[in-house]
Regions:
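Acidic, small-polar-rich N-terminal luminal/periplasmic segments of exported/outer-membrane proteins
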Residues: 1-117, 560
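Outer-membrane beta-barrel domain signature, strongest for Gram-negative TonB-dependent receptors
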Residues: 177-369, 559, 572
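Face-selective signature of the C-terminal outer-membrane beta-barrel domain
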Residues: 292-316, 332-465, 516
């Protein structure tokens, strides 16, 4: 909310995760967040999960109450500098500002702070991982140290180094990460807190296994064998769509195949149990990102009741990916500069107490991005037989692109798709004024209204390209004899560009009513209605093709909840019911409305220093509305001929990819991939002798793996745990994930690729962590 109120008095569903939970349960990315909070689910997101799903929609990350740039799976947030985090449902408050993407909720990182009492040093080393059937090396070391330099100045430094591989063949997981923080007590009235961070990593997109079927979901039975373009049926020879020579005569048809409209040859097809560590990753595939960010907070106390707070956040990053099978991404600039000035005033009018926050907020965000997923022939590859030889068959014929025919100037090997909002240069200037007042009407009843107005100026255009080919009116790729340079915002005779700008005024309203039955409880009702930017699915930014609607996307939250702390603050319980109305984005296609309604329960119990228990439960009914949801392939059976039986059904022989859209009956369907029921529990015991154990289940209910509901992932239970032993200056911990060695899966980009791909999580795996404390 932008103030210092406690979690019980916050009129929102909030879950707090402390440093001990993060360390003990080895929180590494957004896929680990759901165990701590109801309403949170994190799918694999192509192996680089940057943000979780909250209440049926994507979410965003804040740092100390300031909005970070959105990144679905390109630049994942670093946790090296994070001391704890809060998971908040719904839009950001009047003070924080609503999210620019992912209106479901947000994760607010609380950064590591310097120590003023004495010098503290911790060295932590993790060795692993021992996994069933396929162990892999991924050691990491963290050095975290800090202390006072004087009675007014203190510092903290944390360095993380991780080398080695991920679980899947050809997967990498490498990071170098430095975090530095200082706190300076300038005077009794002025305090300055600052931190800066730089990290770079090399990982891989893990798109999972292809040729998905229900039998593969159930038991790993995979249909192998070579695939080629279908030569019968309504899509016969559509896969031969690359013309050999430039400037062909009219009505020339292609002679080369690009991997689309393919079906597995029934004469050579076979079935095999696919190892879970086989995925569509080539030996030369890579995903790299770099991020530099700095935050400075200055607090000046004018009087005991009035203070001025200024928060500054600067963020700059870039990333790139190259997957020889299907995808190219080049993001040379992700930039954000935000400065928020706040006036905090506590005052009384008669018997009514107020805690007022008002101020001004300015935020600039800039993005330059290219991506090419014009043709992603997932079903063309036999993952079992050709795990080290994935290469897009049309790459050389299509001018070293993945079907887009647009090269990136100065970005050797990278390419772009025409007409994609993922290729953009955008600059957004957001100037806002806000006010929020926590009004204590009676000792038990308080009202918190808020209002925010954002004046947004946005400029968006296509970036510069070098065009080497295009798709003609017959959907045939035609190479150009002479490449054409297209300047930023420009066009060619074959590819229209765009250069748009707009200015809008977004108004957001917030209202909460809070009633305290006693000092340790609260019953609240919240209504929030916000206008905010809805950017692109992958990188945020804006949708330059539909700029005005992109800048004024509405989201509404209705929430009623009850919270209480019992038994001398050893037991915390919260419950809420909610309805959220918002918009989601597609990789290809228009934004679509989402309505999510549900019930959330959360409990934390620490009766003494030995026992800690927590659990949560979610029931949600998330519905997506729309008449068109783009699909790479319309039916998973399209990859098989009618003479091939899969899941007891004959193939359609249509071939995939086949670039279609799905129109759900009645214009509505369950939100793609979102489970209706989730539950998590965990218990930890610490012996006075220094040893301890923790374990608990994570349950995810049935999930539809494609829009049609013809593929589903049954309910899954994953048990994780650890054992440890420690003394005052050291401790040792062994973590085990998926203790019961269950087959666990996640949907991937359900609307877009649900009929093509599915993600298989690792089986049982273990790691060893040793920590030294000084």
């Amino acid at each position: 909310m932008g103030d210092d109120r406690n979690i019980v008095d916050t009129p929102r569903s909030v879950s707090s995760v402390n440093a001990a939970w993060m360390q003990d349960r080895m929180v590494k990315n957004a896929m680990d967040f759901s165990q701590f909070s109801p309403g949170v689910y994190a799918e694999a997101q192509f192996g680089i999960p940057g943000v979780p799903y909250i209440r049926g929609d994507l979410s965003q990350v804040y740092y100390g109450g300031q909005l970070s740039l959105y990144s679905l799976n390109s630049t994942p947030p670093s946790l090296n500098g994070v001391d704890s985090f809060d998971i908040v449902k719904g839009p950001g408050s009047a003070v924080y500002g609503p999210q620019g993407e992912g209106a479901g909720g947000y994760t607010d990182f609380v950064m590591k702070q310097p120590y003023f009492d004495r010098q503290h040093t911790e060295i932590s080393a993790t060795l692993g991982y021992w996994a069933s059937g396929h162990s892999y090396s991924n050691p990491s070391v963290t050095i975290d140290t800090g202390g006072p330099l004087s009675d007014k100045l203190a510092y903290r430094v944390s360095y993380l180094s991780r080398y080695g591989d991920g679980y899947y063949l050809n997967d990498h997981d490498q990071t170098q990460d430095v975090y530095f923080a200082v706190t300076y007590l300038v005077s009794s009235r002025l305090k300055i807190e600052a931190w800066t961070q730089f990290f770079e990593d090399r990982t891989n997109e893990v798109v999972g296994a292809n040729r998905v079927s229900q039998q593969f979901i159930w038991n790993g039975t995979y249909v192998g064998g070579p695939a080629s373009p279908v030569t019968t049926g309504p899509n016969a020879y559509f896969g031969y769509d690359i013309i050999a020579a430039p400037n062909p005569p009219p009505n020339t048809y292609g002679t080369y195949a690009d991997g689309t409209y393919v079906a597995v040859n029934p004469a050579t097809a076979y079935t095999v149990k696919l190892p879970s560590y086989y995925a569509l990753i080539g030996p030369g595939d890579t995903a790299r990102s770099m991020l530099s960010q700095t935050q400075i907070k200055a607090t000046f106390d004018l009087t005991p009741d009035i203070s001025i707070v200024n928060r500054f956040l600067n963020y700059f990053g870039h990333s790139d990916k190259f997957e020889a099978s299907s995808y190219s991404e080049f993001v040379p600039r992700e930039q954000s500069v935000q400065d928020r000035l706040e006036l905090h005033d506590e005052f009384s009018i008669g018997k009514v107490d107020s805690n007022l926050i008002t101020g001004l907020d300015f935020r600039y965000s800039g993005l330059t991005s290219y991506q090419d997923y014009q043709t992603q022939p997932f079903g063309y590859y036999d993952v079992y037989a050709t795990v080290n030889t994935f290469f897009y068959p049309g790459y050389r014929y299509e001018g070293n692109t993945f079907g887009g025919g647009l090269q990136v100037p100065g970005g050797a090997g990278f390419s772009a798709s025409p007409g994609s909002d993922g290729s953009q240069i955008s600059n957004v200037y957001d100037t806002a004024a806000f006010i929020q007042d926590d009004i204590k009407l009676t000792p038990k009843l308080s009202l918190t209204p808020g209002f925010r107005v954002d004046r947004i100026e946005a400029y968006a255009e296509n970036p510069a390209f070098v065009q080497v080919g295009f798709y003609n009116s017959n959907f045939q790729y035609q190479p150009l004899a002479t490449p054409i340079y297209i300047p930023a915002g420009g066009s060619s005779p074959y590819t229209p560009g765009y250069n748009n700008s707009d200015t809008v005024t977004d108004q957001s309203f917030f209202l909460s009513l809070n009633y305290k039955l006693n000092e340790t409880s609260s019953f609240y009702m919240t209504y929030d209605h916000v206008d905010a930017i809805l950017g692109t699915n992958n990188f945020g930014g804006v949708d330059g093709y539909t700029l005005q609607s992109s800048l004024t996307t509405k989201s509404t939250l209705y929430e009623v909840g009850y919270k209480e702390s019992f038994l001398g603050n050893t037991l915390y319980f919260s419950s809420d019911v909610f309805q959220q109305l918002k918009y989601g984005t597609q990789f290809t296609g228009p934004a679509f409305p989402i309505k999510d309604e549900g019930l959330e329960l959360d409990l934390v119990y620490q009766p003494n220093k030995r026992w800690t228990l927590n659990g949560n439960f979610t029931y949600q009914d998330a519905t997506a509305f729309g008449t068109y949801f783009y699909q790479q392939t319309g039916n998973y059976l399209d990859y098989y001929y009618p003479t091939t039986t899969v899941d007891g059904q004959p193939g359609t022989g249509l071939g995939g990819l086949n670039f279609v859209g799905y129109s759900p009956p009645g214009g509505r369907m369950r939100a793609p991939g979102i489970p209706q029921v989730q539950a998590n529990g965990f218990a930890e015991y610490r012996s006075p002798m220094g040893w301890g154990v923790g374990a608990g289940p994570q349950f995810i209910g049935r999930q539809y793996a494609n829009d049609q509901g013809s593929l589903h992932i049954p309910g899954e239970i994953e048990y994780d745990g650890y054992v440890f032993y420690g003394r005052r200056t050291w401790d040792v911990r062994v973590n085990v994930k998926n203790i019961t060695n269950k087959r666990l899966l996640d949907p991937i980009a359900v609307s877009f690729a649900g009929n093509d791909l599915i993600y298989v999580r690792p089986p049982i795996e273990a790691s060893l962590t040793v920590r030294l404390h000084f």
